[in-house]
């Protein structure tokens, strides 16, 4: 009789595992009630904001936007279209496709979570099968071999449902890694600009980085390049002398008016990284999308703003994390149920 009751109890516990924690995203810590005295209304509102940022994957959902080895604002990085130092941009990813036995760089990407890389949707126009892709993370030399560099297969590619290839509207995509990457001094996520009320202007310190061509008719490089750029007003970018009104509200321009610093072919999908002094962190304020040529006067690079896609991005982050938790809990439940049957058989 006792064994029978034990079996029923185990069945109850097993079934409860199917649903427990289902609504708690992976990698987040649920905050219980504080043992401190009742907080003021201002303190309560601050807590609510922090919790909301955690749920939505905001600026401080995890430590992000800092490079352990370098500090760009102290002049330790080479700026101006030259070689980036190792560890300078630990969130920059090389997205590669295998041709024969060789992996070839196709597009850039940005590590925003331990299993998520942000990139441009048009990078996948000729290769939408995730099995074709590999993410190379934690290197400035894509031909080098280093213990801190990781090569991870892609589990899924998620393209924005309203992406239009002809106009590059909604040119945003997510690569879901097959396994979580472990952070180190050379691999760190950048912050997403959610709940960050910062208007970009010409004084905001922003940087581009990638393995693309160093000039319009030149060759790609195996050494990561970087340069400082600045935001260019929508009025100037959409003027008749520039893009003539084709830049949508979800995109913007950055570079410089003379075209001295710009992204080029092979840099697509990589980040526009801006340092926000209020947070003392870097944020991915743009995704490299397209441009008219490379480095042409009056035609700066065009970037997609991730902040316009907060709902779409967070839905995928949350869905993937809860799906993983549910799978684990179902497995636990199945194991416990199997154990119950073993106990029942042993008592008959």
Swiss-Prot record:
Key word Hydrolase present: yes
Keyword Hydrolase set for record: yes
A GO molecular function held by the record: serine-type endopeptidase activity
Cytoplasmic side: 346-348
Active-site residues (renumbered): 122 (charge relay system), 171 (charge relay system), 268 (charge relay system)
Protein EC: 3.4.21.-
InterPro entries tied to this protein: Peptidase_S1_PA, Peptidase_S1_PA_chymotrypsin, Peptidase_S1A, Trypsin_dom, TRYPSIN_HIS, TRYPSIN_SER
Domain Peptidase S1: 78-318
Cystine pairs: 107-123, 206-274, 237-253, 264-294
Enzyme class at the top of the EC tree: hydrolase
Region (Disordered): 24-46
Signal peptide (residue range): 1-20
SMART domains for this protein: Tryp_SPc (SM00020)
Impact reported for residue 88 to S: Found in a patient with azoospermia; uncertain significance
Distribution of this protein across tissues and organs: In testis, expressed in spermatocytes and spermatids (at protein level).
GO cellular component: acrosomal vesicle; plasma membrane
Domain of life: Eukaryota
Record field: transmembrane: 325-345
Keyword annotations: Cell membrane, Cytoplasmic vesicle, Differentiation, Disulfide bond, Fertilization, Glycoprotein, Hydrolase, Membrane, Protease, Serine protease, Signal, Spermatogenesis, Transmembrane, Transmembrane helix
Extracellular-side segments: 21-324
Result after altering residue 22 to R: Found in a patient with azoospermia; uncertain significance
Note: Expressed in colorectal cancer (at protein level).
Similarity annotation: Belongs to the peptidase S1 family.
Protein name per Swiss-Prot or TrEMBL: Transmembrane protease serine 12
Gene behind the chain: TMPRSS12
């Amino acid at each position: 009789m006792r064994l029978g009751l034990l079996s029923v109890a185990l069945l109850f516990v097993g079934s409860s595992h199917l649903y427990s924690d289902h609504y708690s995203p992976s990698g987040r810590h649920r905050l219980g009630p504080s043992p401190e005295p009742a907080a003021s209304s201002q303190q309560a509102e601050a807590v609510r904001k922090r919790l909301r940022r955690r749920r939505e994957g905001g600026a401080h959902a995890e430590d992000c936007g800092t490079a352990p080895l370098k500090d760009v604002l102290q002049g330790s990085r080479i700026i101006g279209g030259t070689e980036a130092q190792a560890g300078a941009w630990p969130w920059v990813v090389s997205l590669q496709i295998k041709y024969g036995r060789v992996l070839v760089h196709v597009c850039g990407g940005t590590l925003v979570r331990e299993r998520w890389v942000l990139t441009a949707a048009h990078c996948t126009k000729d290769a939408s099968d995730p099995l074709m892709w590999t993410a190379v993370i934690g290197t400035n030399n894509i031909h080098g071999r280093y213990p801190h560099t990781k090569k991870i297969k892609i589990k899924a590619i998620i393209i924005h449902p309203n992406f239009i290839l002809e106009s590059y509207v909604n040119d945003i995509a997510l690569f879901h890694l097959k396994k979580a990457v472990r952070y180190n001094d050379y691999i760190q996520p950048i912050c997403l600009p959610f709940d960050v009320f910062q208007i970009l202007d010409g004084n905001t310190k922003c940087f581009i980085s990638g393995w693309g061509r160093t000039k319009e008719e030149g060759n790609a490089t195996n050494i990561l390049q970087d340069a400082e750029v600045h935001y260019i007003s929508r009025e100037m970018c959409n003027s008749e002398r520039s893009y003539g009104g084709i830049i949508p509200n979800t995109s913007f321009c950055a570079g410089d008016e003379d075209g001295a610093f710009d992204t080029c072919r092979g840099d697509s999908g990589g980040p526009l990284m801006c340092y926000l002094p209020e947070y003392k962190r870097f944020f991915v304020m743009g995704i490299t999308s397209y441009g008219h040529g490379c480095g042409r006067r009056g035609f700066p690079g065009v970037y997609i703003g991730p902040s316009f896609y907060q709902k779409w991005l967070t839905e995928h982050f949350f869905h993937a994390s809860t799906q993983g938790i549910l799978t684990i809990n179902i497995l636990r439940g199945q194991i416990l149920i199997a154990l119950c049957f073993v106990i029942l058989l042993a008592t008959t």
